[in-house]
Amino acid sequence: MSPIVFLHIPKTAGQGIHAALETLVGDPGRVSPVRVHTQCRAGSQMPPGYDLYSGHIDWTELDTLPPDRFAFTVLRDPRERIASFYFFLLKESRALSPEALARPENTGKRAVLELSADDYFFAGTPGWQTFVRDHYDNFYTAYLATRRMRGRQRLGGLSEAERLDRARQGAAALQGIYEVDRLQRLEQDLSARFGRPVTLAGRVVNAGEHVRGERRWPKLLARFESDASAARLAEFTSLDDVLMADLLSSDGS
């Protein structure tokens, strides 16, 4: 079969989509083992020979796959994605022991637990600020423009218009851009490709401690001590708002 590539942006209901894709592919041996970009810092994130590539991965190697591939991603209201990511890390951090929290790989989880929202997003060392901005600051724009999970710094020196233009060019290399609240189109496209019904609605994994449909963004803003900090956080969606509206409009959503 032609390869399926699911570029899973964190906190966009991707775990349920990945599980559905695994079921469709059938053979676990046909699923690429690379699920996170940090697994292969120097190696291939899209090793040849698999039917499914799915995860928080860079996609600089997309053009090495057969031209009849089906590559897609799913977007979510960028404010809700930011808030959901924050609360997910907070939940994860609370489940860790002090010893586990002290490990270097859990620096982000330790920070979200110990710091105020103001300090988590806008204080700390330059290295910490790079981490925060790479994961939260107009992530869709950076990911589509650079094809990298942590590609934001590669856009340094570009104007907002240039960043958006590069992101649109990147998106044009994909066969589908979908919205998390409207997965019917993805269901239809996958059903047509596999020749059998595909159901994605309701396959929510890692929903966290929130009522289904509850908005996370207001809850995150309420954690800020400074209105100025809350306003700065809103700027983390300024480009993504424009990009998402453009892409979903042009994609027929």
Which residue ranges define each predicted feature?
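Non-transmembrane alpha-helical segments in soluble domains
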Residues: H18, E22, E187-S191, D241-M244, ...
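PAPS-dependent sulfotransferase catalytic domain
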Residues: C40, G55-L62, P67-T73, E80-L200
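PAPS-dependent sulfotransferase catalytic core
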Residues: M1-W59, S84-F85, L90-L101, T199-S250
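Conserved aromatic-histidine-acidic binding/catalytic patches
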Residues: V5-I9, F70, L174-R182, A228-E235
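A residue-level signal for conserved active-site and pocket-lining positions in enzyme catalytic cores
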Residues: A13, D77, Y178, L190, ...
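Short, well-ordered loop/turn elements at secondary-structure boundaries
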Residues: M1, P47-P48, P66-R69, A171-A173, ...
